[in-house]
Amino acid sequence: SRIVARVEIKTNAQLQQMARAGVITSRALDAAVAAARPGVTTDEVNAAFERTMLELGGTSNFYGYYDYPATVCTSVNHEVVHGIPGDYVLKDGDILSIDGGAYVIDPATNRQWHGDSARTVLIGNASEARAELSAVTREAMWHGIAALATAKKVGEIGLAIEAYVTEEYGDKYGIIEDYVGHGIGSQMHMAPDVLNYAVRDMGPKIKP
């Protein structure tokens, strides 16, 4: 399997390499977001990400992964995740998810270290409903991240996310359970699974 089953513990030096990959991914996403506007194709959004990633010395960890043909995923409106860039022309009011990643190679060890992130973009004048959906999702993410300050187990992240959504909005919004977050490091997809919802099994312990 390409997915490592055990949780990978990193050294400080390895975390620094991951930070390099994360910065490259973030700046490439900045370029992709800036390119995403009415009249632009999702393929052009992909090209903006790729151009910046390469300029900064990163290598795509999406392209060629299980034969994936692009450097980002572009999911528009009803598409949940993993949409493939192409000739779709973005329109005023669309909601676009851009998911991309990059890796760097540690010159001391020749090992890869990966970054992977996503952004949601409201194209032009999106509806209030779509703007609220994006805002609620972002805030839920930050509640999950904040939970890490005191969490003992990985499952507390999903618990915090679900608690925020249900306590603030009741049943107005649901949480998709078909896809989950994941660990990252010397590979793009690694243990542990990071759920966005609460489950009985709280998963592995969090180690400093």
Residues of each region from the PLM?
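Active-site neighborhoods and metal-handling regions in enzymes and metal-associated proteins
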Residues: S1-P208
